[in-house]
């Protein structure tokens, strides 16, 4: 007997069973999934970084 893992939808907070019966997991629906994607695309959400933008100077494709 296996226990079902239950998570909350990150968008609306509804409970979602983490399993094949929930194709949009961790979201409860396609709508909540698209709302989250839109927030990332609009840069309302971001992964915090301690890096300085000057660190990317070494990544330049231009040759000195």
UniProtKB/Swiss-Prot annotation:
Note down the stretches annotated as region Disordered: 45-64
The cofactor note reads: Binds 1 zinc ion.
- Annotated GO biological process: regulation of DNA-templated transcription
Q: Which co-factor is required?
A: Zn(2+)
Zinc recorded as keyword: yes
MF-aspect GO terms: DNA topoisomerase type II (double strand cut, ATP-hydrolyzing) inhibitor activity; zinc ion binding
Q: Which amino acid positions bind Zn(2+), per UniProt?
A: 9, 12, 28, 32
**Swiss-Prot/TrEMBL keywords:** Metal-binding, Zinc
Q: Which Pfam families match?
A: YacG (PF03884)
Q: Which domain of life is it from?
A: Bacteria
Q: Which InterPro entries match?
A: DNA_gyrase_inhibitor_YacG, Znf_NHR/GATA
From start to end residue, where is composition biased (Acidic residues)? Answer: 54-64
Q: Which HAMAP family match?
A: DNA_gyrase_inhibitor_YacG (MF_00649)
Describe its function.
Inhibits all the catalytic activities of DNA gyrase by preventing its interaction with DNA. Acts by binding directly to the C-terminal domain of GyrB, which probably disrupts DNA binding by the gyrase.
The entry describes its oligomerization and partners as: Interacts with GyrB.
Which family, according to UniProt? Belongs to the DNA gyrase inhibitor YacG family.
Protein name (record): DNA gyrase inhibitor YacG
């Amino acid at each position: 007997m296996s226990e079902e893992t239950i998570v909350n939808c990150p968008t609306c907070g509804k409970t979602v069973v983490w399993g094949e019966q929930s194709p949009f997991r961790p979201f409860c629906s396609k709508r909540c999934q698209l709302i989250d994607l839109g927030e990332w695309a609009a840069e309302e959400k971001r992964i915090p970084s301690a890096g300085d933008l000057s660190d990317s100077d070494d990544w330049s494709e231009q040759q000195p």
